[in-house]
Regions:
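Catalytic cores of the polymerase beta-like nucleotidyltransferase superfamily
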Residues: 1-447
């Protein structure tokens, strides 16, 4: 079986072989190539010790030298080169206390997480597949190398990685591997929020975000996202819905692009429904206030999972306004754009459509027609270059200073008042008119 290796990878392998060492491309890059996917990274495993690797290449970085890893830099691209090793006992469900270097490739492959990731390749030896990884690729199965409880005991994040790979590849998790996840799910508490976040985002932005069902079923979400468990367990007894909050959420995620902000928004858009639910005398559920409450809950969750501030800001804004329904008039839509931000409107329309398509058929066409009208009005406003941001005003502070106004609170109030008027009456947005209005406002304040 022939794999086309990138030139830099061939170069590194060849250089190590020239010095009498074994070297192979290994892990995910081999898996992805066999699946016809483009690897994000190419990792290399070798019998050469780290100091030897460092001596053979002019530009290297000690990325994990204690565990045998040196990054070789070629043309500003990094390639991790790791010495064959046997891992000692793991101390924190993440790192081995000790590693022992070995000259045996198969011993190195034994320590890896899943069979599909335990294959190696070079042009001389071809594919080295000691654990039938190719068979699991053909069967579309995620299966641990060796005893699943041992692999997950070594690194608890592997449990979430199993589900993430299932989501990315469209595979299923083999039964013994699945059972081990269920047995050891609580160990995920030992893993940092940053590592969990990385795996969660990869899962959510995959082709199969519905694997969040597996995250819930195996007990993983109760460790890092217990709010999702409550969503899965909260029914929606209303003609507008046909799924529980959690199932609706999963369907909504499937209705948006594989985009980080959109998938996170759909994951959290109804997060407050379990805490806002009320039931009327007819037995129907209502979720009044859930968008605003959800935005606050989303902020807490995203901070807990160590997301960056910009992601938190955008997701929380979209959660807050996902169910906002202004009357579709140019004035109302201009004010909505001003409130939400022109840069967020495209995402908001995607969120609204996904939310609607994940509901029952009750009034679906009416709801979609409303979104279409909202978006059409928004586009007309942009096409006509109407003022929807303060920076779009035909005047600014410098113009007011030139007219004799002093800087400070009063100027800010005048600019805000002019902006409010222009949102209602866009034809006012010209310099001459606004300067005259500013003068009137200033005189009124002085009276």
């Amino acid at each position: 079986m022939k794999i086309q290796l990138p030139e830099h990878v061939k170069q590194i392998i060849h250089r190590l072989q020239q010095e009498g060492y074994d070297a192979y491309a290994v892990g995910g890059c081999v898996r992805d190539t066999l699946l016809g996917r483009s690897p994000q990274d190419w990792d290399i495993t070798t019998s050469a010790k780290p100091q030897v690797v460092k001596s053979l290449f002019s530009h290297t970085i000690d990325t994990g030298i204690a565990h045998g890893t040196v990054t070789v830099m070629l043309d500003h691209t990094g390639y991790e080169v790791t010495t064959y090793r046997i891992d000692g006992e793991y101390e924190d469900a993440r790192h081995p206390k000790t590693v022992t270097f070995t000259g045996n490739l198969v011993e190195d492959l034994k320590r890896r997480d899943f069979m599909i990731n335990a294959m190696a390749y070079n042009d001389t030896a071809g594919l080295v597949d000691a654990f039938d990884g190719i068979g699991d690729l053909k069967r579309h199965v995620i299966r641990c190398v060796g005893i699943p409880h041992d692999r997950f005991g070594e690194d608890a994040l592997r449990m979430l990685r199993a589900v993430r790979f299932a989501a990315q590849l469209g595979f299923s998790i083999e039964e013994k591997t699945r059972q081990a996840v269920a047995d050891l799910a609580d160990n995920l508490q030992k893993v940092s929020a940053e590592r969990i976040q990385t795996e969660m985002v990869k899962l959510l932005t995959s082709a199969h975000p519905e694997e969040m069902r597996t995250v819930y079923a195996l007990g993983l979400s109760r460790v890092f996202l217990p709010e999702f468990d409550r969503m899965m367990e909260t029914p929606q007894i209303t003609k507008h819905h046909c799924y529980s909050v959690g199932e609706h959420t999963i369907h909504a995620m499937q209705e948006v692009q594989q985009d980080r902000i959109l998938r996170l928004t759909m994951l959290l858009h109804d997060v407050a429904k379990p805490v806002c639910v009320t039931t009327d005398e007819k037995g129907q559920n209502h979720f009044k206030g859930h968008p605003a409450e959800g935005a606050e809950m989303a902020r807490v969750i995203l901070r807990r999972l160590k997301f960056d501030n910009e992601t938190i800001k955008r997701v929380c804004l979209l959660v807050r306004y996902h169910d906002d329904r202004p009357a579709v008039t140019p004035r109302n839509v201009r004010r909505a754009i001003s409130r939400i931000g022109v840069e967020n409107m495209e995402a908001l329309f995607a969120v609204k459509r996904a939310d609607t398509l994940a509901q029952s058929m009750y009034e679906r066409q009416k709801k979609l027609s409303y979104i279409d009208a909202y978006e059409e009005t928004y586009r007309e406003i942009l096409k006509e270059h109407q003022c929807v941001q303060k920076k779009d005003l035909a005047i600014n502070g410098r113009d007011l200073i030139a007219q004799g106004m002093k800087t400070g609170k009063e100027m800010g109030e005048v600019l805000q008042a002019l902006y409010e008027q222009v949102l209602d009456e866009p034809q006012l947005n010209n310099k001459e008119t606004l300067l005259a209005l500013a003068l009137q406002l200033q005189q009124t304040k002085q009276e």
